[in-house]
């Protein structure tokens, strides 16, 4: 069909439905009634001769044709919005914006307390939302603006993304403060003689630790596997297990959980923690402000 035959206001509803996946939420975000959103979707379906969205228990899922339209429509909407708001400024003191950051639970433990304390003074009405996404969904989320920044070791975010180094992370051995292993220097032999907690942090670079130890022939006695780091402090304080964790997490856990962080007997590769954002939002004033704040607070 010809573009002149399409009511472009319908694409605003389409674009918001791509993000919200629920008619009620889209109506609220656009300041419309639910019947108005439903009617707009009905008209767009008729114009494009495609269902566009199919109702599921997880919300409105886009059809293949809607998914095909998603990127160009989102890009066009963002370009138009930027053009219309070109002369507007971002004032953190009065803004009520919600910023969405993708990070692991380590990131939440390490970054959030300090960031939220500063935001209480510099941007008291702003909201922070954290998410965890797979590499592919994260790429799309950064591209369409549902995620503002991603923080971590994310080697798949390259083409189309900017990045900036925040800090370096090295690994230590974490255990309870009165653990027998703390009585003498931690050798590789003693390290391997105790049971271990292994954290399988899917979608992050921390799996490289296991890969490296396997490659150099180090075999730990794995007694427990967990999918995230948040439980490690609770587990170690009441067991004789050891855990290999990044120093930034250890710094946050030692005092609250009564733990000791020991130099690791294995020389493990350091990991770089970077901050990523999509090229489309490189000049977005709010994004620029948040990036600079993160850099000022956390860069080594």
Curated annotation (Swiss-Prot):
**Protein name per UniProt:** HTH-type transcriptional activator NahR
Q: Which family does it belong to?
A: Belongs to the LysR transcriptional regulatory family.
Q: Any idea where this protein resides?
A: Cytoplasm
The record's function comment reads: Regulates the expression of the naphthalene (nahA-F) and salicylate (nahG-M) metabolism genes.
SUPFAM superfamilies noted in UniProt? Periplasmic binding protein-like II, Winged helix' DNA-binding domain
**What InterPro entries does the annotation carry?**
LysR-type_TF, LysR_subst-bd, Tscrpt_reg_HTH_LysR, WH-like_DNA-bd_sf, WH_DNA-bd_sf
Q: Which UniProt keywords apply?
A: Activator, Aromatic hydrocarbons catabolism, Cytoplasm, DNA-binding, Plasmid, Transcription, Transcription regulation
Q: Which residues bind DNA?
A: 23-42
A GO BP entry: catabolic process
Q: Does the keyword Iron apply?
A: no
Q: Name one GO cellular component term.
A: cytoplasm
Cite the GO molecular-function annotations of the record.
DNA binding; DNA-binding transcription factor activity
What region holds the HTH lysR-type domain?
6-63
Signal peptide, first to last residue? none
Annotated organism of origin: Pseudomonas putida
The record's section on Gene3D superfamilies has:
Periplasmic binding protein-like II, Winged helix-like DNA-binding domain superfamily/Winged helix DNA-binding domain
């Amino acid at each position: 069909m010809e573009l002149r035959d399409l009511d472009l206001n319908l694409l605003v509803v389409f674009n918001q439905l791509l993000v919200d996946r629920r008619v009620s939420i889209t109506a609220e975000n656009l300041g419309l009634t639910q019947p108005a959103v439903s009617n707009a979707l009905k008209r767009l379906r008729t114009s494009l001769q495609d269902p566009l969205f199919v109702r599921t228990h997880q919300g409105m899922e886009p059809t293949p044709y809607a998914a095909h339209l998603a990127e160009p429509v989102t890009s066009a909407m963002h370009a138009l919005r930027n053009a219309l708001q070109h002369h507007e400024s971002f004032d953190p003191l009065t803004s009520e914006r919600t910023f969405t950051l993708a990070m692991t639970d380590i990131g939440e433990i390490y970054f959030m307390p300090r960031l939220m304390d500063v935001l209480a003074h510099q941007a008291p009405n702003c909201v922070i939302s954290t998410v965890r996404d797979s590499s592919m969904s994260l790429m799309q989320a950064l591209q369409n603006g549902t995620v503002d920044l991603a923080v971590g070791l994310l080697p798949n975010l390259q083409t189309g993304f900017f990045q900036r180094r925040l800090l370096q992370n090295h690994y230590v051995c974490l255990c309870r403060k009165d653990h027998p292993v703390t009585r003498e220097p931690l050798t590789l032999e003693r390290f391997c003689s105790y049971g271990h907690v292994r954290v399988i942090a899917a979608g992050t670079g921390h799996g490289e630790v296991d890969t490296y130890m396997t490659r150099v022939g180090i075999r730990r006695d794995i007694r427990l596997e967990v999918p995230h780091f948040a439980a490690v402090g609770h587990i170690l304080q009441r067991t004789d297990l050891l855990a290999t964790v990044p120093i930034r997490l250890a710094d946050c856990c030692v005092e609250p959980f009564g733990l000791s962080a020991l130099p690791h007997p294995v020389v493990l590769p350091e990991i770089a923690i970077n901050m990523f954002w999509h090229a489309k939002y490189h000049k977005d004033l709010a994004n620029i402000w948040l990036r600079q704040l993160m850099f000022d607070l956390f860069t080594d």
